[in-house]
Each structure stands twice: as C-alpha cells, then as structure tokens.
Regions:
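...with weaker cross-activation on analogous glycine-rich loops/strands in unrelated enzymes
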Residues: 59, 113, 117-181
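Low-complexity, Gly/Ser/Thr/Pro-rich intrinsically disordered linker/tail segments
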Residues: 188-199
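N-terminal capping segments
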Residues: 37-115
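Cell-wall glycan-active module
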Residues: 1-64
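Short amphipathic beta-strand/extended segments with alternating polar/hydrophobic composition
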Residues: 181-187
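Generic hydrophobic secondary-structure packing signal
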Residues: 25, 63, 104-107, 137, ...
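A broad, low-specificity signal marking well-ordered, structured residues that form hydrophobic/aromatic
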Residues: 64, 169, 190-191
Length: 199
C-alpha cells in the first residue's frame, strides 16, 4: 500500500475520533486517540481506503464512529448483566437475552442501526454472508465474516475490518475476548467481506 493511502486511512480514523469527541465528549475521544496511538501503521498492514460505492462517504463509513465509541464495553461476570449488550441483542432475534451468549452479530447489527442502515436482524455471524454485496478486497469498515471451528458449520464470527497483514486480519467488534475491542484473527478464517447495497 502506498504511503499516501496509509495517511488517508489514518486521517479517516482521526476523523472518526473527532466525531466521537464532538458527540460524546472528550473522554470518549481520548479513549479512541489512545487506541490509535497503540496501533502501528505500516504500509503492509494498514487499511485500504478505497471507495466501494464510488462516492466520498463510502471511504468513511458512518457506522465506524458508532462502533469505535463502544470500545471497552464488556460482558459482566456471572450474577450481573451488562445492559448495553442487552441493547445490542435487541437489534436481533435475541431480544431480551443477556450478555452471556455470543453477541458479535448483535453488536454489528446495533452499530448499523445507529447509522440508519438495516442489518441482518440475526444473531448468527454467518447471516452477514447474505447481506449487502460481496467485496473482492476488504476496505476500512467493511464487514468481515470468519469461520469458526469447522468451515462447513453454521458457527462464525463477524466484525468490522481495520487492516490485515500476511497472516492476520484485524477486526474491531463485539464479543472479542468478551468485549468491544480490536483483535487479530488468522487471515485464512475469513470467508467473506461485505458492504451495504446503495439505496
């Protein structure tokens, strides 16, 4: 990836942080800034700021500030429930469920709903393989669907693509070590990248 593209990707993330600061205050902005500073940006493992929908807004997806603002939301220990994760589940067919179930797809659905984009409404990660349109190459903020265990099974994981290198893909998502955070996964577990259909 060219140095110019790396800088454009970093600019998108900084703009997301500014939007979060404006809407949710300085503390939220500082959380994101700290996360950005901990993330290394090198040409071979940064995001591709391409524009799948051929308009200026596609390179800066509106759901990413929503997702990044949730950094650190985590599953509560047994005996208590995180009400925010219950909110995520309420965007799916798991209405009313607590935070003790898999909630990666619930988080993605919740973020998309906050950006006024209809998600799958399903708590199954692989439901995103039928949503939107496929991408040949991942772009910042696209939805990445991963296999889990047996590639032929219904199990999976879903999150928002940040970047990749030769071996790993870095996603921002929910239920990643039981919280909303960035996490690396084996690149060979990716089974699809998706983007909303325009209109």
């Amino acid at each position: 990836m060219a140095a110019r593209e790396v800088e454009e990707a970093a600019d998108m993330i900084r703009a997301d942080r500014k939007e979060i600061t404006r809407k949710q205050g300085a503390a939220a902005g500082r959380r994101i800034r700290a996360k950005i500073e901990r993330t290394s940006h090198s040409p071979e493992n940064d995001v591709t700021p391409s524009n799948p929908e051929s308009n200026a807004n596609a390179a800066h997806p509106p759901w990413m500030p929503v997702a990044l603002a949730e950094l650190g939301i985590r599953r509560h220990p047994p005996g208590s429930i995180n009400p925010r994760i219950v909110e995520y589940n309420n965007q799916t067919n798991l209405v009313g469920y607590d935070d003790k179930i898999s909630w990666c797809s619930s988080f993605v659905n919740w973020c998309m709903a906050r950006a006024d984009i209809r998600g799958t409404g399903s708590a199954l990660a692989r439901s995103w393989l039928e949503w939107g349109r496929p991408l040949e190459r991942p772009v910042y903020g696209c939805i990445a669907v991963l296999t889990r265990d047996d590639p032929a099974s219904w199990k999976g994981h879903v999150g928002f693509y940040l970047r990749h290198d030769e071996e790993q893909v870095y996603l921002f998502g929910g239920n990643q070590l039981e919280e909303v955070r960035e996490l690396a996964y084996p690149l060979n577990e990716v089974i699809g990248y998706r983007w909303p259909v325009a209109g």
